[in-house]
């Protein structure tokens, strides 16, 4: 899976989670990989 696909999936999940719960998730799983808050925020801030 390309990083742009990973970023898009993380972004969708994080937005939905924030919309329904009012806070960002502690971690996000994409495929078989579990990203911590710090890791997925780094990915979301990347310029691709």
Predicted regions and their residues:
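Acidic, low-complexity, intrinsically disordered interaction modules
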Residues: 2-48
């Amino acid at each position: 899976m390309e990083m742009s696909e990973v970023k898009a999936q993380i972004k969708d999940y994080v937005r939905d989670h924030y919309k329904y719960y009012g806070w960002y998730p502690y971690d996000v799983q994409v495929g078989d990989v579990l990203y911590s808050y710090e890791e997925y925020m780094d990915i979301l801030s990347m310029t691709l």
